[in-house]
Amino acid sequence: IDKYRKWDYKMPENFKSYLYISQLLQARGIKTAIEAHRRAKPFCMGTLYWQLNDCWPVTSWSSMDYYGRWKALQYYVKKLYSEVLVLPFVENKKLNIYIISDRLKNINGRLSLWLKDFDGTILWGYSSDVKIDANTSKPYFSIELEKLVGENDTCSIVLEAEVKEGKKLLSKNLFYFVKPKNLKLKKPLITFRHMKTEKGYR
């Protein structure tokens, strides 16, 4: 775990943080594999990951623990195995936006892309109607990385990609230009409210 963690993440401050980072590391690794397999359609028409759950309380590869609690990976694979997946992928110094569809009918959708900084400011945007071919994986947009990034600091930006069918969101994916340990994340100010209801809290 520590060997691979050093590739992508900084040293966690304590054991609790170490456990959390190890879950993110696992989720990111499996995400990379599943996206590659799905992008390779029709040469790869399916993929399984090891493993779904545990038969006793243990440190393992599972995406759910013995008690059925979801780890980071379980949240990732729920989105990764959606029937439509939008996928930013770098090839030959270009950022290509693939859309993978497992549906057996064509989709009239809309592809939207935004380059944002970590304050949420939109630095660049693109939107276009797309006819998503049934049961395929192919690129629907391409741009030179250098042109997209421009003068922006790659450690401080993210590309947000989404595909909609009408008002329904089919897929959303984020693309970072550097490893997580190199991101210049700002400490957020998070506020929340909760309210007691008959069914619990919301």
What annotation goes with each model-predicted range?
Residues T59-S60, Y126-S128, N173:
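Short hydrophobic alpha-helix segments
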Residues I1-R110, W114:
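Substrate-binding clefts and catalytic carboxylate motifs of secreted carbohydrate-active enzymes
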Residues L170-Y201:
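Edge strands and adjacent loops of beta-rich recognition modules
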Residues K31, L80-S82, W124, K184-L189, ...:
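Residues that act as N-cap/strand-start positions at coil-to-secondary-structure junctions
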Residues L85-V86, D102-N106, K147-D153, T191-H194:
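Short linear motifs in intrinsically disordered
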Residues Y20-S22, M64-D65, D129-N135, L148, ...:
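Short, contiguous acidic/charged loop-to-helix segments that flank catalytic cores in large enzymes
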Residues K94-I143, D153-K164, Y201-R202:
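Beta-strand-rich binding/interaction modules
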